[in-house]
């Protein structure tokens, strides 16, 4: 799968194969990433298992396109807080990779294009300050 980005989004295209990225993601999450998700991330050609997409009806977007909709404070909310509306890529997707979609679905927080806390370091710099401040306290 190819990772595509719109202008203005700073996101490493090689982060899927980077062990450093996995370490950073783990520090932003409540616990270690389950082994089955790490394995699936390394073998991205595998199709989604039914378990990866079995979710409540509130998860309305396909897992292959996590940020098709621009999240707003009034949209569907993740389990632990509001979605910061400033932190969407202009007119585009955050990522179409299997890893980002599966991790969000596995944690059960993916809703309306919101990003979970452990992807915070991959948001473009203009958004990081908002997450570090008001939003960060809602997620952690």
From Swiss-Prot:
Residues 34-88 are annotated as: Disordered. Expressed in a range of cell lines, including B-cell lymphoma and prostate. This is Putative uncharacterized protein encoded by LINC00114. The gene is LINC00114.
């Amino acid at each position: 799968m190819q990772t595509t980005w719109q202008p203005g989004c700073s996101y490493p295209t090689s982060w899927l194969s980077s062990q450093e990225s996995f370490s950073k993601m783990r520090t932003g999450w409540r616990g270690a990433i389950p082994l089955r998700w790490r394995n699936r991330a390394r073998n991205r050609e595998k199709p989604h298992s039914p378990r990866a997409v079995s979710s409540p009806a509130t998860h309305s977007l396909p897992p292959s396109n996590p940020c098709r909709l621009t999240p707003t404070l009034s949209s569907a909310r993740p389990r632990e807080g509001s979605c910061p509306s400033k932190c969407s890529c202009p007119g585009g997707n955050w990522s179409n990779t299997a890893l980002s979609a599966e991790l969000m679905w596995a944690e059960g927080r993916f809703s309306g294009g919101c990003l979970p806390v452990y992807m915070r370091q991959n948001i473009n710099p203009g958004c990081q300050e908002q997450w570090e401040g008001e939003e960060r306290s809602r997620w952690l």
